[in-house]
Amino acid sequence: DLRKKISPIIKDIKTLKEIIVVNKDNRFEDPLVDNDLDYEALMKDVSADSFKLVNTSQYDFSIMHYTSGSTGKPKGVLHRHQAVVQQMLTGHWALELSHGDIYFCTADPGWVTGTSYGMIAPWTNGVTQIIYEGGFSASSWYEIIQKYKVDVWYTAPTAIRLLMRSGEDVV
C-alpha cells in the first residue's frame, strides 16, 4: 500500500537512489515495481560483519517523521540522535518505565508516538516491549495484556473511547 502512495512523486525526487521494499510475510503478490530492490533478497546471504559501522554525532539526523497533513501537505520532520536522550528520560519519568517491565504501546510505529514511545523509550529504559501489528482490536489488545502480563500500557484517548464502546463482552 505504501509503495503505491509514493509512485506518483518518485520522478520528482532528484536525490532518490533506490527504493527497498520490505515484504517479510509476502502479504502482497507483487510488491516490487520497476527497479525496486527486494529487502529479503538483499539480506538473504549477508552476515552481520558485512556492515560497516558509521560514526555519527548527537547532532546528526537519525529519523524522519511525516506530519499528518491535516493542515496542508505532509512535511518531513527530521529528528537528531540527541532526541533519544529526551525519549529515554520521558519514558522513565512520564511512563515510569524501568528494567523488568513489560510494555505495550498501541501506537503505529509509522507515527512519531509509535517510534518515540513505542520503540525508543522502552529500548533505552531496558524494558520488554510488545509491538502489535494491526489496527484497533479490543479483543486482541486485551488478550495481549493478559497473555504477556503487561505492566505498562500506553495508548491514545481515542483508543480508550473505542475500548469503552466495545463493551464488556470482549473482556
Predicted regions and their residues:
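Structural core segment of the AMP-binding/adenylate-forming
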Residues: 1-41, 146, 156, 168
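Alpha-helix/helix-capping structural signal
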Residues: 82, 158-161
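Conserved phosphate-binding and hydrolysis motifs of nucleotide-dependent enzymes
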Residues: 68-72, 76, 81
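Short hydrophobic/charged patches on amphipathic alpha-helices used for structural packing
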Residues: 7, 53, 138-142
